[in-house]
Structure formats: structure tokens, C-alpha cells
């Protein structure tokens, strides 16, 4: 069985490490890379072409929504997006932007 390629874009180091750790416990996922801001995330997504992208909504250089709008035209593979944030106020917008799911930080197993 092929593993799902995963990428995480999040400026919160602790949240990024926690999610990476939890994903590492599941044999279905292979974490291919992480990025700490939108600019790095854009490069990571193009390089890795993840099946599943965990994307923080609020980052210092651009929002996750802005990043998604920037890459939308260049994603030619089937990539699912999980918006990952501490603020539930973004849930409706995330779904409108074609989010596969929405995960609130901090998450619990």
C-alpha cells in the first residue's frame, strides 16, 4: 500500500512538531516536509506534490487562504487540504476555499 504524502505549513513550531509526531504514528502517512511560512510552503508544495496538506490559516507573511489562492492554478494533482488553526472563525471560509477538512489547534488524539 502506498503511503499518503503529507506536507505541513505552519509558523507555530510546537504545533508543527506535535502534528508531525502524531502523523508519524500512523503508517498510512509519510511526512515529506514542513514549512514555517507561506513562501516556504509554496516551494514545498511544488517540490513534494503532497496528497494531503495541513495548512495553518494565520502566518506572518501570508494567510493560508492567500497561499491556497496563489497555488490553485498550479496544482495538477489530487491534493486534499486540511486547514489547521487555533481559530474556529475561519471554518466557513476554509470550506468555501475547498478545504477537505478543518482541524482546530491544539488538537487531541
Predicted regions and their residues:
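Conserved acidic segment of CheY-like receiver
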Residues: 3-14, 19-23
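Conserved sequence signature across two-component system core domains
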Residues: 9-10, 35, 53, 85
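Alpha-helical interaction/dimerization surfaces of two-component signaling modules
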Residues: 22-26, 44
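A generic structural motif
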Residues: 27-31, 77-79
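Conserved Asp/Asn-Gly motif in the active-site loop of CheY-like receiver
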Residues: 32-39
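CheY-like receiver
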Residues: 42-109
Amino acid at each position: 500500500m502506498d503511503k499518503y504524502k503529507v506536507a505541513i505549513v505552519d509558523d507555530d513550531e510546537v504545533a508543527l512538531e506535535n502534528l508531525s509526531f502524531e502523523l508519524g504514528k500512523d503508517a498510512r502517512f509519510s511526512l515529506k516536509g514542513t514549512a514555517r511560512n507561506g513562501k516556504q510552503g509554496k516551494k514545498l508544495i511544488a517540490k513534494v506534490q503532497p496528497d494531503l496538506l495541513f495548512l495553518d490559516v494565520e502566518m506572518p507573511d501570508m494567510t493560508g487562504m492567500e497561499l491556497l489562492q496563489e497555488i490553485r492554478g498550479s496544482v495538477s494533482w489530487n491534493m486534499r487540504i486540511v486547514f489547521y488553526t487555533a481559530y474556529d472563525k475561519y471554518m466557513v471560509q476554509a470550506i468555501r476555499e475547498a478545504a477537505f477538512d478543518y482541524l482546530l489547534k491544539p488538537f487531541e488524539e
